[in-house]
């Protein structure tokens, strides 16, 4: 029958059946309606994205996988199987959620509605951290390597951070531990410390090791010898000096110093007429009262420098002054070189100053140039120094009659173009520092022929050999960009090293004029070791590694086998060891022998001065040992003048400065170390240093022994060519009592046996100690 597009329905009623027909006027169809589709959304947790999930079967768009989060479309009733990755971003699969059923990484979904499923992952977990060795002893003065074992689940991190803790209530340092678990012991040390390793992934998980710190057992030390019959040279009393900066009268008196220096950056521009100075780059280039020169309180009715001379005279110490060579002095007590009103955008300001003085740097820390030096300062020439010396002679007498003994020719030309760049922006040259030095020295000597002059007061290894102009030119000259790379100034002066040229010119002046203008070759020697990337100078004692580096680096003053990578060979092209390499080898500085050689070659008769140095650790016994070693070296090596520069207020640094008391006031009655050096040797200077001297006032042999180790050492001290006249007096300074040098029981001196001229003592030298022995001699 032909389909006419009719719809037929059978209507059933009570006992009746009706056939209903409805026919349309157009054509008809029998195509079924489209199937229903649903969306399957796939998420992930930990991580929230990027997890690869595969789907079977493919969806209606022929897609079978994706990276979370993503969606698939399926017809109603479709049965879909999803498979997730077992790990994602190092995290482990844990479960599915939203599935019809799931089994491990497989998720089954029947698509009867829009459905969202989530693949859940868990991050790696840390279960525990253990530290080995645990427990363990650690001998003071050594290092211990610790390892950490981290346990956990998943792709966890084994990284840890290391710390070391002192016992609760302890004020002693626990030592240090580096990022790799290498522990360095402290001294002085608590009885125990705890080394802790903490997981970087989960800081709630850590492990520890109990460390017992033990002193080394008493051991036999090296043989020591002092030859009373071998007097090598007189020891200058002026090696026991300090800089006046922050030096209070009590410290100066108790340490019985012999000379005090008015020096440092703030003294370069001191104006004696107005008693004002400029702080230079040290503090915002500010003018201020003259007390800025030494940091001491003002004395009524007296200029700062005059007050220092008066104070020094009271305790019997000589005064070493500083006269300007760089050409400027402060003109008042309030101006500054870079006030905010003139330079409104600087990196830093001193808002405590009414002028809001700036640091002379732009906001990006580039240097401001072209400032007017006359805002703060007055230009002066050599006659200024001469007039000042004449004034001082009138006030205090000539040097020969108790006045100012020595004058430094300014301070550290090396840094004039940095520290004093507001008035001296250009680096110094050979001619400037030499010619101005000669002219200023002549003015000083004319005003006081009995005064001594010291110069060039040079800091910085490279400026011993090159002018600062050379050094800065070298820094910008390839391929090495090194201090020696462009030595035009040196080349224009016959290739002569700067210090030697300086000496030669003063020698030439004397030869032509029969007048010595330079009495001391003067250097600043900040040559303390660098340890773990930091200088040990101007710091606290540190761990035993730092302490040992500090003590070892005193060798820089004398030892031909000691080198430091900071001090390379000068590398001038005519040097016999010159190399074109940009990494020339280190050179042993041998500072005092080097100075002595320069003088012998270039200006015989010139004395040797080091009027700034600092080895740090001064709050501790370690600083005292280093300072005592330096003073002993100064005496043994024949230095003529030395003045220590403080870390901070000397009264708070007395453990370190007690080294001066060892040599100048060991018994509290101003008894001193001898004044005539005796040949003295130690079989191991790194363990026990020994310095001997004859005290000519009473014929006693004085000996200083420094135990640099962390254990007690017994040693035989042989006194050659000495017959004792009684027992030895013994004085000890150690960590057992940092407040005082303590008298010990007398020590028997065994006289020479028949056929010998050598007496002996057999003391025990406590760990980290300084011992003074006074042996009466027939």
Cite the ranges covered by each PLM segment.
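C-terminal beta-strand-rich structural cap/linker in extracellular carbohydrate-active enzymes
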Residues: 113-123, 749-778
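Glycan-recognition and catalytic regions of carbohydrate-active enzymes
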Residues: 620, 631-702, 727, 738-739
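Carbohydrate-binding surface patches
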Residues: 684-726, 730-733, 768-774
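N-terminal catalytic cores of secreted or lumenal carbohydrate-active enzymes
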Residues: 219-548
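Glycoside hydrolase catalytic-domain groove-lining segments
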Residues: 446, 519, 526-614
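Catalytic-core region of carbohydrate-active enzymes that cleave or remodel glycosidic bonds
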Residues: 439, 443, 504-512, 579-648, ...
